[in-house]
């Protein structure tokens, strides 16, 4: 795994700090809207995915791709964006989708 150069960490810190603020506004705009729920598991078991999961992941991916176009992105809902970069972003747009579905505010995003 590559080492982030000492002077580069500020770029990532600033980006993630701004992304967190943008995500808060984006999530807040979506919370009062209805969403569709489907089961990712076909057959046995239940693993919900919502239209919000997909919208949030698209939003996060777009921000990362705009700032770091060569970085690899691995997302729970849309898989990998392959790249030759040594840098990878891993996204779970709604960690705690079951809680999100029932209106329990104990969910978050993971980047």
Stretches found by the model and what they are:
Residues 83-111:
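DPxDG-like acidic metal-binding loop motif
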């Amino acid at each position: 795994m590559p080492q982030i150069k000492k002077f580069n960490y500020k770029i990532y810190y600033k980006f993630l700090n701004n992304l967190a603020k943008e995500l808060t506004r984006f999530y807040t705009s979506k919370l009062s809207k209805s969403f569709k729920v489907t089961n990712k598991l076909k057959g046995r078991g239940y693993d919900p995915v919502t239209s919000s999961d997909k919208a949030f992941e698209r939003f996060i991916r777009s921000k990362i791709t705009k700032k770091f176009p060569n970085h690899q992105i691995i997302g729970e809902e849309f898989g990998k964006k392959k790249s030759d970069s040594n840098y990878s972003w891993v996204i779970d747009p709604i960690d705690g989708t079951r809680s999100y579905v029932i209106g329990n505010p104990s969910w978050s995003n993971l980047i």
